[in-house]
């Protein structure tokens, strides 16, 4: 069941049960429901002792409850917008958060007697298995991306059966089994971390795999994916260096190979000037870009961030309540943001698309206030510091390597959260589950 949960991470934008709301298109949700059922069953039968870190994790959730009470009168009187009222948005978004908290709790309960190393091996195997399936699909999608249409019937066949929206990426960007190209790129960042972890044992075999991942990311044309991969690769090398392992020099050589592959690929994909290409990509996220292709998206993304921060500043203690930011965003968008058709659609009550916030941090600030954001960040920082302590102080070499992996996944998750405004980022919840379990194992050994 855990294998399936991780295996289905890249399967997004799929046909699903309407009752699941925004989660219906995420295939991992369905094995996750079974996992929650098992967690409840284990709780009834065995009454397990709660993990201390999980109890700490419930403190930010308490702020959600306080925010509901603090804003309840505004929530119930919220006029209908885009066919939703305050209570329906409160229920749907609270359900998403509670669901992933229950998934994390269930993982802790169901796998209480299993070692972190065993669980990690299952997760890594699932990541590579789904990646191989994804790669097979991408082989048929790449001809379309580079301008050929002879594989379109096969792509359409898959879309007609599985995808919620039957269309091909009209900009000819690789999206694989995901809803859109950025989602694919985010998943491939996870595969990069798994690849580096496995490369400790058989590095040569994984150089080609890393190259293939880099090719797929370049064909997704994601503006942040290549930069994310470079950052997370360097972060992994930094964390690995903290282990003071005798193999550190060899591993740094391997990291150098990985980065060299990334830079060469970047250079080739940009006509021979990778540095200039990377700088242009960084500049392309600005609202002052001359790139019309990116401008509408940038105005929408930065406009929503600006509006979310403004909402948070006006409601800085508890925010406006979970799920409520969309009602306020149209009044807070800056004038320059309306240059984007996306913002105009988000502000139109007749358009069904709910106004998004493209970062969990600004969303938490607007909906849960400064207290909610501070507690969320504190929880993550505490876990990160405890993992760092394992890396530098544990006498168990394998625990050090596991801590490096989990610390890298947590950092990656927090980077992805900077451009993802929903709590349904499964890799984050799996990372903190494994981190809490490893910390608990270390505590038990030291007692």
PLM feature spans:
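Membrane-interface helix-loop-helix junctions at transmembrane boundaries of multi-pass membrane enzymes
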Residues: 1, 40-58, 197-208, 244-250, ...
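N-terminal hydrophobic segments of proteins, predominantly signal-anchor/transmembrane helices
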Residues: 2-17, 32-102, 410
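Helix-loop-helix junctions and helix-breaking kinks within/between transmembrane helices
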Residues: 15-27, 67-70, 74, 92-95, ...
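Loop-to-helix entry and N-terminal half of a specific, functionally important transmembrane alpha helix
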Residues: 2-6, 205-213, 351-359, 366, ...
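Long extracytoplasmic/lumenal interhelical loops at the membrane interface
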Residues: 168, 290-306, 310, 314, ...
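Juxtamembrane membrane-water interface segments that cap and precede transmembrane helices
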Residues: 12-20, 80-83, 160-177, 303, ...
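A membrane-periplasm/extracellular boundary helix in multi-pass inner-membrane enzymes
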Residues: 142-146, 240-291, 310-313
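Alpha-helical transmembrane segments of multi-pass inner-membrane proteins
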Residues: 101-106, 121-158, 166-170, 175-242, ...
């Amino acid at each position: 069941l855990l294998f399936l949960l991780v295996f289905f991470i890249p399967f997004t934008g799929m046909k699903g049960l309407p009752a699941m709301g925004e989660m219906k298109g995420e295939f991992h949700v369905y094995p996750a429901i079974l996992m929650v059922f098992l967690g409840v069953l284990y709780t009834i039968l065995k009454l397990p002792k709660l993990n201390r870190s999980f109890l700490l994790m419930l403190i930010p959730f308490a702020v959600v409850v306080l925010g509901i009470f603090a804003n309840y009168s505004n929530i119930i009187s919220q006029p209908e917008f885009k066919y939703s009222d305050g209570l329906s948005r409160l229920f749907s978004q609270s359900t998403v958060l509670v669901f992933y908290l229950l998934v994390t709790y269930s993982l802790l309960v169901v796998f209480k007697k299993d070692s972190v190393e065993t669980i990690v091996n299952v997760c890594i195997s699932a990541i590579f298995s789904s990646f191989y399936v994804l790669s097979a699909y991408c082989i048929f999608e790449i001809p379309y991306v580079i301008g050929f249409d002879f594989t379109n019937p096969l792509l359409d066949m898959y879309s007609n059966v599985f995808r919620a929206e039957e269309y091909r990426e009209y900009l000819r960007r690789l999206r694989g089994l995901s809803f859109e190209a950025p989602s694919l790129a985010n998943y491939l960042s996870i595969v990069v971390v798994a690849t580096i972890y496995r490369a400790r044992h058989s590095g040569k075999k994984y150089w080609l795999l890393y190259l293939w991942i880099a090719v797929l990311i370049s064909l997704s044309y994601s503006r942040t994916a290549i930069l994310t991969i470079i950052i997370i690769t360097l972060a992994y090398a930094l964390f690995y260096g903290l282990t003071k392992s005798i193999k550190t020099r060899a591993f740094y050589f391997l990291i150098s190979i990985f980065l060299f592959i990334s830079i060469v690929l970047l250079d080739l994909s940009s006509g021979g000037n990778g540095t200039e290409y990377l700088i242009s990509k960084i500049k392309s996220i600005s609202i002052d870009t001359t790139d019309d292709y990116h401008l509408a998206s940038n105005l929408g993304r930065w406009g929503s961030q600006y509006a979310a921060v403004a909402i948070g500043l006006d409601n800085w203690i508890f925010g406006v309540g979970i799920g409520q930011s969309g009602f306020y965003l149209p009044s807070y968008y800056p004038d320059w943001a309306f240059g984007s058709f996306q913002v105009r659609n988000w502000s139109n009550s007749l358009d069904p698309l709910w106004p998004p916030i493209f970062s969990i941090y600004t969303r938490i600030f607007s909906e849960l206030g400064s207290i909610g954001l501070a507690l969320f960040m504190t929880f993550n920082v505490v876990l990160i510091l405890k993992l760092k302590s394992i890396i530098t102080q544990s006498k168990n070499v394998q625990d050090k390597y596991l801590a490096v992996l989990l610390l890298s996944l947590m950092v990656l998750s927090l980077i992805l959260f900077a451009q993802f405004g929903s709590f349904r980022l499964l890799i984050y919840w799996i990372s903190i589950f494994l981190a809490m379990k490893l910390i608990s194992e270390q505590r038990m050994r030291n007692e």
